Amino acid sequence: MEQLLRAQLHTTTLRAFGSSGGGCISEGYAYYTDSGPVFVKVNRRTQARQMFEGEMASLEALRNTGLVRVPKPMKVIDLPGGGAVFVMEHLKMKSLSSQASKLGEQMADLHLYNQKLREKSKTRQNTVGCGAEGAEPQGVTKFGFHTVTCCGFIPQVNEWQEDWPTFFTRHRLQAQLDLIEKDYADRETQELWSRLQVKIPDLFAGIEIVPALLHGDLWSGNVAEDDQGPVIYDPASFYGHSEFELAIASMFGGFPRSFFTAYHRKIPKAPGFDKRLLLYQLFNYLNHWNHFGREYRSPSLGVMRKLLR
């Protein structure tokens, strides 16, 4: 692999440093190169290129806002024996602590970014002498993303939809439940789902949802800080409801209260927030069930029952 990296990165220097690491899905290695330190993720699954290309597109979208700090993505490279590697900027990070409040503010700004773009675009169109065309981005009007992304190793369809409940039900919940049906044929899950899915539109009654660019997998293992401030990484981005982002952040710990306080100063909770948060947590429990097995069956069904009360 090192010979491949030297050739693809056009570097004479390739010296490993630090300890190898990674998460549940991929291995991780750090190297010094002629152009500076890089972090290399390695995955030998057949769909590794698709997974890494989705992550690269997500990092680029987040980075282009100028509102949050992410590692600069560099290159996805196929491995000769199957799988792929993803090369990105190496950042010397530590666990999120003193920068939690700042990250809350930055995530709120990120979630408001597309709305502000759309408002600017409308203003330009309504101004005499200003056409709709121009170099400035116009803002996104639908829910989805321009490419497949993976939350963990599961590919997510991001086909554009006009309304959020349709997108979320079809491309997030139903997609996860189809995998559970295939692998477990769990009758109780299907019975609860048949009752729940007809109630989902009611949870969104009376609220306006503007597509927001999301990180898509904002748990504590995907956030950190360094000397310059907060850092987020390992995204599975798409344009969705801003509240979706907070579900996994509130599930497994690691985010101080200051994060949520700072966030909600900029984006207050809308009516029905708590019940929708449960709905978004359901997606994450189902995704964990599909990744890690039946230990996540009980919390998945528990959330479904709560939503049916």
From Swiss-Prot:
A Pfam family per the record: Fructosamin_kin
Highest taxon in the source lineage: Eukaryota
UniProt GO cellular component terms: cytosol; mitochondrion
EC numbers: 2.7.1.171, 2.7.1.172
UniProt entry tagged with the keyword Magnesium: no
Keyword Kinase appears in the UniProt entry: yes
Annotated catalytic residues: 217 (proton acceptor)
Keywords: Acetylation, ATP-binding, Kinase, Nucleotide-binding, Transferase
A single GO BP: protein deglycation
Reactions performed catalytically: N(6)-(D-fructosyl)-L-lysyl-[protein] + ATP = N(6)-(3-O-phospho-D-fructosyl)-L-lysyl-[protein] + ADP + H(+); N(6)-D-ribulosyl-L-lysyl-[protein] + ATP = N(6)-(3-O-phospho-D-ribulosyl)-L-lysyl-[protein] + ADP + H(+); N(6)-(D-psicosyl)-L-lysyl-[protein] + ATP = N(6)-(3-O-phospho-D-psicosyl)-L-lysyl-[protein] + ADP + H(+)
Transmembrane annotation, as ranges: none
InterPro entries: Fructo-/Ketosamine-3-kinase, Kinase-like_dom_sf
GO molecular function, a single term: protein-fructosamine 3-kinase activity
Disrupted-gene phenotype: Mice are viable and healthy and show normal blood glucose and serum fructosamine levels. They however display increased protein glycation levels in cells such as erythrocytes and pancreatic islets. Increased levels of protein glycation levels do not affect the maintenance and function of pancreatic islets.
Oligomer and partners: Monomer.
Family statement: Belongs to the fructosamine kinase family.
Protein name according to UniProt: Fructosamine-3-kinase
